[in-house]
Amino acid sequence: MDAGYLGVGAMGQPMAHKLLDAGHGLTIYDINEAAMQPLLERQARRAVSPRDLADRCEIVFVSLPTLAAFREVAFGADGLAQGTAMKLLINTCTVGVPFVREIERAMAERGVSVVDCPISGGPPGARAGTLSVMVSGDPAAVERVRPMISLWGRTLTVAGDKPGAAQVLKLTNNILSAVALAATAEAFVMGAKGGLDPEVMLAAINAGSGRNSATEDKFPRAVLTRSFDYGAEMHILMKDIDLAVAQGEELGVPMWVCEAARLVFKHAMHKGAANEDLTAIVKHVERDSGFEMPKTR
């Protein structure tokens, strides 16, 4: 099955590669020429605008980092909404429930179905094909793209058929991921400054009740190596935390712990960390603690 792919950056490019690996034809578009090149070398075709992509392809995937970017490619000049061939739009972005509902209504007026399909696992999971894929939308549309989106991960969870249901599911995941990273950063700096070997801490925590996505993946991969290259920038995580807090407020759910994690990352952002890797939050905790953990890997 041929498809279009808009946004082939840190997440979109490896996900597009998985579609090519499975024999699907792809037409791609990205404002970054260098991001498209590896896919073009594998015989993907180039679109010249979002509208051109939607003029050529019945199925279009979108992987973009921000709501503003998605809004522009959807509704801006030469946007997807102006295309004539697109019938199914698959949103893999974390953009929050209100925007998903907005784009679902706008596209429905044009005869286009929207499948909400946010993913979790970061660039490493996208490259390995081990993402957690969350999906919601019209059951027939979901089933049509299931063989394609299943290529990205080891699990596919259907959150329901309501617009935005998968966004809510993704935000629950991101709350836990962000809180775990902030808490793990503080815990490890405290322990190391108190004289503990970070590797000893890691082994004990991962064998006990404190293990989490930071201790099992982010710290071994990008913190204890001092590489801080997990592959996702801090401003993207902050955007997701903001969406989660807003969702909680809309539903009348107190988000005190999430708010505390937001303060940790907001403090780092005010120190210029917006474009740093999200694991670099450890360096900001270290700076405020007057202590730097040793490289152990």
What are these model-predicted stretches?
Residues 94-174, 178:
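Rossmann-fold dinucleotide-binding core
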Residues 7, 199-207, 259-263:
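Beta-strand segments within the central parallel beta-sheet cores of soluble alpha/beta enzyme folds
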Residues 128-129, 133-136, 157, 163-194, ...:
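Active-site-proximal catalytic alpha-helix in oxidoreductases
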Residues 161, 270-297:
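NAD(P)-dependent dehydrogenase/reductase Rossmann-like domain
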Residues 1-63, 87, 93, 123:
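NAD(P)+-binding Rossmann beta1-loop-alpha1 motif at the extreme N-terminus of oxidoreductases
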